[in-house]
């Protein structure tokens, strides 16, 4: 029952009758971006109330004035204690908090991907059975590609995420329930009562009033600049600035600069810079107020009137408030006979100001830092062995991620550190699915992992047994979707030093200039099939024809060749042989020497032709013919040989895969055989591609990187030969000088 002041406080707990408890006093703390905290001092005629009927049960405090409800607060009992017992009453103490408080009881590690902030917040609320919430968002909030809750309570994560996105939240109350409202602009605030400023000569019957208003201004950062970096746009600054307002009473040179800004896109950068500025200046213009209006709560505005300082008679919003009430008559045994009283004290800012929580404050804890590197497994979709994107990034499964499925959805694309990384040069070794990697975090940020190392474990063993092969340095790969491997191995054991190379299929080597081998002992080459070697033409300097390639061989000792089948040697011009002593040739059946013009045999002392018992000998003493019969012009036929049946060597075509192995050079002359410099040409290559240009000063053109096959070249003669007679023009011909598939 209300006393003479008209005030009364009542409480209802769980399913207990409303008469179970009477309120002796209460203290209620509320603030933006914080769960409220209600402490109740109660008395009851029951000395043995069942704790199970109270703890974690709904509780509602009602504040009445002259029988009219002024304020209600609904929540759940988080703490219940029994105090002193007397003859009639037993004292109890309750702590009541909103359902959101339950999020502080669960700490977790998890990953959210490609979700908007409000979607992430909804997931967390619903997992705790909270369905009465709303989003009053004015601004667009981009999806977060990768957002990690790392060793945080769900409540800390909600508060931090909301603050990073410039959101704030407050509670609204209805009969038996309360709603959480998330907002990002002051326009979402609820308009509250009009309160007059009471100089002390007016009573409560004239309406709720403000009895104290302390106004304050403070110097705060004047502007904010944030900067970040994205590997997708490395040359772009990603810098954003925001300038504060209401700087008339302070300097405008107090800039707050920070890196990284925790964003990768311009829209987010602009918003985050504004959020940071609003948070840093959230108390630059503020007030501390005392009143008797129980209806006030965070997320609400009120209008102040009748203050002697007319500039303060405007709209204000409440950012935090403490309500206190005492009902002494509830404590009969302690002689409680004073009046029921209520008052509050609260902090305010301008109603037009969008209040945002400052990171690092009780309303918005700092983002947790990862203390050091972590272990993770490379993952990907079923059936894949290597899974990466165009940047060589991979997907990871962290041991602490209980929600991941060890597939391509387990994480965002994570960058991989390589030993060397330049513009289309450097090293590249993609971690494969199932590999264990070491993951570091840029600035300790769990949202920015990067693979910095790889490790073996009990399942993924090293290429060779250890420590038996501890002197080996090995680079071994594994055939993708097949069996086999490539390997480069260094053996450093004294006396057994070795460089070993194993290729599962082909070896292609391209040296743009010279290659030199110095082997100080033996060289053994074992080829199971065929060997094809070519010493080819070398492109000349600009405008010069190519030079011929030569093969030089010097053997200080013997050279022994054993060819078990045929041996074919083709020399397009001349073959010169010079022997220091003897030339000894033995054929099992036939030696056939044939010349297109002449054969000359010249000896310093003797030439002998011998067949069976017959011979012809030419020496310094004359010509000797010996045989059973000497025939001169006696008929018969000359003997014949088998003729040349050698084979040309195989071409290197297709054996070397190089982007610079084929070129084509051509030139064009007039009827006087003078070069036609500057003549436009059009070359249609064998693959249908077209090259166009003009001939150089020598009437020549060189095309590189051309496909093998036949090409056609036509010339635009219209302007070039305008001063020549028709007869000369018709006599002109185009010459395809050389089409070479050699580079």
Swiss-Prot record:
A Pfam family reported for this protein in Swiss-Prot or TrEMBL: Phage_GPD
GO CC annotation, single: extracellular region
Keyword Cell membrane attributed: no
Keywords: Glycosyltransferase, Nucleotidyltransferase, Secreted, Transferase
Protein's UniProt keywords contain Lipid biosynthesis: no
Domain of life: Bacteria
Catalyzed reactions per annotation: L-arginyl-[protein] + NAD(+) = N(omega)-(ADP-D-ribosyl)-L-arginyl-[protein] + nicotinamide + H(+)
E.C. number: 2.4.2.31
Major localisation: secreted
Any one GO MF annotation of this record: NAD+-protein-arginine ADP-ribosyltransferase activity
Family matches, as InterPro entries: Gp5/Vgr_OB, Gp5_Vgr_C, T6SS_RhsGE_Vgr_subset, T6SS_Vgr_RhsGE, T6SS_VgrG/RHS, Vgr_OB-fold_dom_sf
Top class in the EC scheme: transferase
Compartment(s) where it occurs, according to its Swiss-Prot or TrEMBL record: Secreted
NCBIfam families associated with the record: vgr_GE (TIGR01646), VI_Rhs_Vgr (TIGR03361)
Purpose of the protein: Part of the type VI secretion system specialized secretion system, which delivers several virulence factors in both prokaryotic and eukaryotic cells during infection. Acts directly as an secreted effector with an actin ADP-ribosyltransferase activity that disrupts the host actin cytoskeleton, leading to a decrease in host cell viability and an increase in apoptosis.
Membership in a protein family: Belongs to the VgrG protein family.
Protein name: Type VI secretion system spike protein VgrG1
Source organism (scientific name): Aeromonas hydrophila subsp. hydrophila (strain ATCC 7966 / DSM 30187 / BCRC 13018 / CCUG 14551 / JCM 1027 / KCTC 2358 / NCIMB 9240 / NCTC 8049)
Organism lineage: Bacteria, Pseudomonadati, Pseudomonadota, Gammaproteobacteria, Aeromonadales
């Amino acid at each position: 029952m209300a006393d003479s002041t008209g005030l009364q406080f009542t409480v209802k707990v769980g399913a207990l009758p409303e008469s179970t408890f009477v309120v002796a006093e209460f203290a209620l703390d509320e603030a933006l971006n914080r769960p409220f905290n209600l402490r109740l001092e109660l008395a009851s005629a029951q000395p043995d109330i069942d704790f199970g009927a109270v703890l974690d049960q709904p509780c509602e405090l009602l504040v009445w004035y002259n029988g009219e409800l002024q304020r209600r607060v609904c929540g759940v009992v988080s703490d219940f204690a029994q105090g002193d017992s007397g003859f009639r009453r037993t004292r109890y103490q309750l702590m009541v908090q909103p359902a959101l408080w339950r999020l502080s009881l669960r700490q977790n590690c998890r990953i959210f991907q490609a979700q908007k902030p409000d979607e992430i917040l909804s997931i967390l609320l619903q997992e705790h059975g909270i369905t009465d919430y709303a989003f009053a968002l004015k601004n667009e909030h981009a999806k977060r590609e990768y957002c990690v809750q790392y060793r945080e309570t769900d409540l800390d994560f909600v508060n931090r995420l909301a603050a990073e996105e410039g959101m704030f939240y407050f509670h609204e109350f209805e009969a038996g329930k309360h709603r959480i409202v998330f907002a990002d602009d002051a326009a979402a605030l609820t308009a509250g009562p009009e309160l007059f400023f009471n100089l002390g000569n007016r009573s409560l019957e004239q309406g709720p009033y403000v009895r104290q208003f302390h106004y304050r201004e403070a110097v705060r950062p004047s502007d904010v600049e944030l900067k970040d970096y994205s590997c997708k746009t490395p040359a772009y600054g990603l810098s954003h600035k925001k300038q504060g307002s209401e700087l008339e009473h302070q300097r405008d040179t107090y800039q707050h600069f920070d890196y990284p800004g925790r964003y990768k896109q311009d829209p987010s950068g602009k918003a985050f810079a504004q959020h940071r500025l609003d948070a840093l200046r959230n108390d630059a213009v503020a007030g501390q107020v005392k009143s008797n209006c129980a209806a006030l709560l965070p997320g609400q505005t009120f209008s102040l009137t009748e203050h002697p300082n007319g500039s303060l008679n405007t709209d204000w919003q409440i950012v935090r408030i403490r309500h206190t009430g005492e009902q002494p008559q509830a404590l009969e045994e302690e002689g409680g006979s004073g009046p029921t009283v209520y008052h509050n004290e609260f902090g305010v800012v301008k109603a037009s100001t969008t209040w945002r929580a400052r990171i690092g404050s009780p309303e918005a804890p700092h983002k947790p830092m990862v203390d050091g590197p972590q272990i993770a497994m490379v993952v990907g979709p079923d059936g894949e062995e290597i899974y990466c994107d165009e940047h060589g990034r991979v997907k990871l499964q962290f041991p602490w991620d209980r929600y991941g499925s060890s597939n391509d959805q387990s994480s965002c694309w994570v960058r991989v550190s390589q030993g060397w990384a330049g513009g289309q040069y450097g090293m590249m070794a993609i971690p494969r699915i199932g590999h264990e990697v070491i993951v570091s975090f840029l600035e300790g940020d769990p949202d920015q992992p990067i693979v910095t190392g790889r490790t073996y474990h009990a399942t993924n063993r090293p290429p060779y047994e250890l420590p038996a092969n501890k002197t080996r340095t090995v680079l071994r790969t594994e055939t993708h979707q097949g069996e086999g491997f490539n390997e480069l191995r260094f053996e450093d054991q004294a006396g057994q030093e070795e460089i070993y190379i194993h290729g599962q299929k082909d070896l292609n080597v391209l040296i743009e200039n010279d290659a030199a081998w110095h082997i100080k002992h033996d060289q053994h080459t074992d080829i199971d099939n065929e060997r094809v070697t070519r010493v080819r033409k070398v492109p000349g300097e600009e405008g010069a024809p190519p030079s011929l390639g030569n093969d030089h061989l010097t053997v200080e000792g013997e050279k022994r060749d054993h060819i078990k089948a045929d041996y074919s040697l083709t020399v397009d011009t001349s073959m010169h042989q010079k022997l220091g002593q003897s030339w000894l040739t033995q054929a099992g059946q036939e030696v056939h020497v044939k010349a297109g013009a002449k054969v000359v045999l010249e000896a310093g002392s003797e030439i002998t032709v011998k067949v069976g018992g017959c011979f012809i000998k030419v020496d310094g003493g004359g010509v000797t013919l010996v045989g059973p019969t000497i025939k001169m012009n006696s008929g018969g036929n000359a003997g014949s040989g088998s003729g040349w049946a050698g084979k040309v060597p195989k071409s290197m075509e297709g054996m070397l895969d190089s982007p610079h192995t084929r070129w084509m050079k051509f030139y064009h002359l007039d009827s006087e055989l003078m070069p036609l410099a500057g003549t436009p040409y059009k070359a249609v290559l064998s693959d249908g591609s077209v090259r166009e240009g003009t001939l150089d000063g020598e009437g020549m053109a060189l095309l590189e990187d051309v496909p093998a096959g036949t090409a056609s070249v036509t010339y635009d003669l219209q302007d070039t030969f305008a001063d020549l007679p028709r007869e000369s023009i018709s006599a002109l011909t185009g010459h395809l000088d050389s089409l070479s598939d050699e580079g």
